[in-house]
Amino acid sequence: MNSYLLLLMVSLLTCIGQLCQKQAAQCWEQPQARRLNLTLRWLAIAVVSLGLGMLLWLRLLQQLPLSVAYPMLSFNFVLVTLAAQLFYGEKATLRHWLGVAAIIFGILLMSWHL
């Protein structure tokens, strides 16, 4: 499988896992009768997503050196920032967006190696 596709899949699964963990944390605002059941459901989805991401990560490490693959995971910061705005209405400051732009620039620089 293409290294770029594997990296994208790892990042997407990791992002989904993070969003599910956030959702599980917000379940504690629910009435006590529903809280535990909802939290466990979201945590189970998070564990599955993060577990699949880890398996694909191991496959990616067979194709790329760790010194190249690991910095590319910075794409997770970009995805999580966008998803947090989309799904949770979280706001990012100009400084935050400049950091995201720097991460994207770094990923582009690193991708020339691939």
Curated annotation (Swiss-Prot):
One of its GO terms (molecular function) is carbohydrate derivative transmembrane transporter activity. One of its GO terms (biological process) is lipid A biosynthetic process. Induction: Activated by low magnesium concentrations, via the two-component regulatory system PhoP/PhoQ. InterPro entries: EamA_dom (IPR000620), Flippase_ArnE (IPR022883), Small_drug/metabolite_transptr (IPR000390). Pathway: Bacterial outer membrane biogenesis; lipopolysaccharide biosynthesis. SUPFAM superfamilies: Multidrug resistance efflux transporter EmrE (SSF103481). It comes from the Bacteria. Pfam families: EamA. Its main location: membrane. It is a multi-pass membrane protein. Heterodimer of ArnE and ArnF. Translocates 4-amino-4-deoxy-L-arabinose-phosphoundecaprenol (alpha-L-Ara4N-phosphoundecaprenol) from the cytoplasmic to the periplasmic side of the inner membrane. This is Probable 4-amino-4-deoxy-L-arabinose-phosphoundecaprenol flippase subunit ArnE. It comes from Yersinia pseudotuberculosis serotype I (strain IP32953).
